[in-house]
């Protein structure tokens, strides 16, 4: 069993896509790369040092990688939610329609990554038990 956080994200994404989206993994390398983005470093420092920036690059990486034959946006969204939950965080007051709209806007490049991170920050709250 691995303790690498990117491996845990990879395993979650594959499991979710297979069970909820009927998506088959068509590029393990692309998905592993996307799941590793939040943890990339340069000169010993994280490139994305905050939970917000890590969450933003995670979702962007998964949806743009097209690692599955179906369900890339849904899998990216749910992996984002899983990532936040692992950090005892969640998104507040986000309807399914709003979540879909923000993901589609990111995928179609109508929403910049920095603006998406800002959107996450606006909705981020501690996860209550």
Give residue ranges: language-model regions:
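FIC/Doc superfamily catalytic core
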Residues: 1-129
